[in-house]
Amino acid sequence: GGGGGWAAQAGGQVDMGVFATGESNNQAGSVNIATNGAIQTAGVNSTGILAQSVGGGGGFLGINTANDYRMLLGSSSSEGSNSSFDVSVDNKGAITTNGNNSAALIAQSIGGGGGSASINWKETDDQDGKASTPPLLLGGVDSKTANSGNITVTNQSSLITTGLASPALLIQTIAGGGGAIQSLDDAYAGIIEF
């Protein structure tokens, strides 16, 4: 509801969320997922299951770039309410991921907040040749109200990940807050706000 979405392989400025929406209200719906079969993925940023209820928030952002950029994942300058609802996942099949930044299962209820970001940047500083980091903003800014829902996850099978920064299970209910950032690079700290 008035939220972001999913982006990958992006360069330059990247903004996902709600900006200067005045008195608008951003309401997301409930999410219900039931799986019975096996799921297997390969490659970077290849999550097995991603279940999100996002109201005025972010989404999922996967970046693999050699360019500098700014990332804003969340809501900004909204006088209305940002509300997400319940997320339910019932998984009965084995999930296997074989790439970096590839969780087996992510469940998030986000109201005016952030989301999940996987970042792999290669921008270097001309002065010392070391990697530099872009400004990152993950979360809600100046939102009037932010409410997130409940999350229920029932897992009856194996969750296997083989890559770096690839949790088997990530569960978050976020109201006007942050989210999750994963980076594989030996980069120096930039501006990170939650």
Regions found by a protein language model. Give the residues of each.
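Low-complexity, glycine- and small/polar-enriched segments
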Residues: 1-194
